[in-house]
Amino acid sequence: MEYNVEDLSPVKKKITITVPVEEVNAALAATIAVYQTSVNLSGFRKGKVPASIIEGRFRKEVYNEATQDLVNVHINEVVGSLDTQPASRIDFDGGQLERDKEFVYTISFEVMPVFEMPDYDGMEVEQEKPEVDENEVNAVLERIRTNLADVVTVAEHRPAKDGEIAVLDFAAYENGEPIAGVAADNFELNLGGNQALVDFEELVKRAVPGEATEGDVTFPEDFINPEFAGKTVTMKVTVHAVKERKLPELDDELAKKAGGFESFDKMRETVEQSYLESRTQLCKAQAQKTMVDSLLKTLDFPVPESMLEMYMDSLLAEKKDRLERQGKSLESLGKSPEELRDEVRPEAEHIARTQIFLVKAAQKEGVTVSEQEVDRQLQQIAMRSGQDFQTMKEHYTRTNMIFNLRDRMLADKAMEAIYEKAAIKEVPAKKEAAEAAE
């Protein structure tokens, strides 16, 4: 077997492999021999079927398997001899083996770019000093208070207000006919919580308990269900009750209910400590990002297109999820798939460049990720999503997602290694950051 390597670009290789006749015939003979041990044909003892009969009867299967086996052996041999590993799937072009003929085929794949690593030992990195924001702490305490509030029916005969809960029946109509799927009974609507369309909430706030009302409601143009986008329908509403939350006092009794704290002061102290730890991690993460971004500015290397496509797909999937949680869709943005991909391309390229740099830094630092560490990470993912660990591992392995997961874990370790070698300079929190937190 001979091969020739052609660099199509700094991150893509094409390899032409030439297989001599002797190796082609040997591969066919080996595959036929496997069939001879397992095939049962009338008139022949098992294992005694002549090779010519096997080749004639199972020609398609034999030649397909022989080709695949031979190509796989060569790919492992050729790729193993190179200084780099594929960063994409390996594309094969070459047809099928033919007996007594030389077999020539090509494989092509993308590789990680080659570049000189910058010196980052002792580089100065500014990191903001974490501070406790009393407004943020108070907001957490208010959320705890709200969660422990008693929900009671309002005795006063009046419409519901923002911050209260309306118990109601509703149904949508178009041209006097009910719209299937847009109706509910005894629905509890939290008013002022962006749970429903503004027009609908205003309609609800007009009715007192026991009263029915109706009015027009217009769905936004970017509504997630295109069937209703921009459409005006008639909503009929009957309010049954108005409920309000009776907030408990911020005292020791609340602290005990919230989590067994011995006092309110102890609960507040715990919330402050948790907030400070969160801010510390946030400040560290921002410093690490600034550090890597600074190093990336000194480097110029191309990104494999397959890697770029993968991150663009991921960013668009995240965008789709965010929009759907808001009752919208990608289509509602009024942009073509190409325009959407162009929008996320710069961010995807930055993520890819960061990943490439950190994986190379991991090699430089001798950082590795064990199979046990990958399994532990998969167990956490499975637990959070409520799925079976073994099923998830098989899915990650089958779809090659496990390699992406390992690289992300490797990148995280490399980030820590670079950070440990940096000269961290603690600076006061920026005023605009503090104001944004408020």
Curated annotation (Swiss-Prot):
Subcellular location: Cytoplasm
Catalysed conversion reaction: [protein]-peptidylproline (omega=180) = [protein]-peptidylproline (omega=0)
Source organism superkingdom: Bacteria
UniProt cross-references to Pfam families, sorted A to Z: Trigger_C, Trigger_N
Top-level EC class as recorded in UniProt: isomerase
EC nos: 5.2.1.8
Family: Belongs to the FKBP-type PPIase family. Tig subfamily.
Protein name: Trigger factor
Classification of source organism: Bacteria, Pseudomonadati, Thermodesulfobacteriota, Desulfovibrionia, Desulfovibrionales
